[in-house]
Amino acid sequence: MKLVEKDAEKKMKNVGASSTAEATPIVLVVDDNKAVLEFLLLLLSKNGLAGIGASSGSECLAIVRSRQVDLIILDVMMPVMDGLKACEELKKMCPSTPIILLTARDDMMTRAAAMDLGVSEFVAKPVNNRDLMSRIQVQLRNLEWGKAADQVVSQIDRSTSHPKK
């Protein structure tokens, strides 16, 4: 049991520490405005994160079906499938993936609908770069902590389970 506890302590201490062996987090950015999309992808890149762009809710869903992403930044006001509808579908597909909702529509009804859907953060446009990057880092750190905690629990479960006789 001591080995498990030491390993658990080590994993929890390493959470948040960058390592070349760890994969770069992948952030999916969804915005129908090409200039905003390109700007956000550049901001992510300058901060050491990998970004994938999508210009619609349906394109976002197709990407999430084909690959894993660590975080989604989603615009609310988009044609065909708005960000709230896309968020509803995303929460069915990948419920533990954090979603940051980005919008020029900062009203209480939109905010309430977003929170009801389980959005992690709600950011109003125009975006403050530092604020957005801070929120992204917090969500990625929380995700990393959650994964580390799951690994520790799994390891403890394996070490304490006994074969049935």
Task: Label each residue range with its predicted role.
Residues 38-46:
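Charged docking surfaces used in two-component/phosphorelay signaling
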Residues 85, 106-121:
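Alpha4 helix (beta4-alpha4-beta5 surface) of REC/receiver domains from two-component response regulators
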Residues 67-73:
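Active-site beta3 strand of CheY-like receiver
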Residues 55-59, 82-86:
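Acidic catalytic/metal-coordinating carboxylates
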Residues 1-26, 140-165:
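Non-catalytic signal-transmission and effector/linker regions of two-component phosphorelay proteins
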Residues 109, 127-136, 144:
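C-terminal output helix
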